[in-house]
Amino acid sequence: MGKPATPRALPENEAKAVARMLRVSPQKLNLVAALIRGKKVDTALADLEFSRKRIARDVKKCLESAIANAENNHDLDVDDLVVSQAFVGKALVLKRFHARARGRGARILKPFANLTIVVREVRAEAA
């Protein structure tokens, strides 16, 4: 007598991976996420490999996780995968204190972000 199985939230031809609490602002992470949105996964991996952004390594790791989920958990063909969605959400913001001159202080905000990548299998139609 257990809980009933929850229905699958994604269609049968999709898989996703989520990277939480990435230590980067959502705006900066969205620049890298926009770089791979809508591309084939091999092209997206190559773009992330040669990107000069610091967070590109974490985005690449999340994309590789989504590809592995598609292959191992959902039996999708890796050669037909496309990044259908790559979206960013805000996580918490650490607030720190920085002592300034004349007894003053300044707040330092250290934002975190969440990244969700959804890959979809797009079959090439035989023409």
From Swiss-Prot:
This is Large ribosomal subunit protein uL22. Keywords: Ribonucleoprotein, Ribosomal protein, RNA-binding, rRNA-binding. The gene is rplV. InterPro entries: Ribosomal_uL22, Ribosomal_uL22_bac/chlpt-type, Ribosomal_uL22_bac/org-type, Ribosomal_uL22_CS, Ribosomal_uL22_sf. GO terms for molecular function: rRNA binding; structural constituent of ribosome. This protein binds specifically to 23S rRNA; its binding is stimulated by other ribosomal proteins, e.g. L4, L17, and L20. It is important during the early stages of 50S assembly. It makes multiple contacts with different domains of the 23S rRNA in the assembled 50S subunit and ribosome. The globular domain of the protein is located near the polypeptide exit tunnel on the outside of the subunit, while an extended beta-hairpin is found that lines the wall of the exit tunnel in the center of the 70S ribosome. GO terms for biological process: translation. Part of the 50S ribosomal subunit. It comes from the Bacteria. GO terms for cellular component: cytosolic large ribosomal subunit. Belongs to the universal ribosomal protein uL22 family. It comes from Methylorubrum extorquens (strain PA1) (Methylobacterium extorquens). Pfam families: Ribosomal_L22.
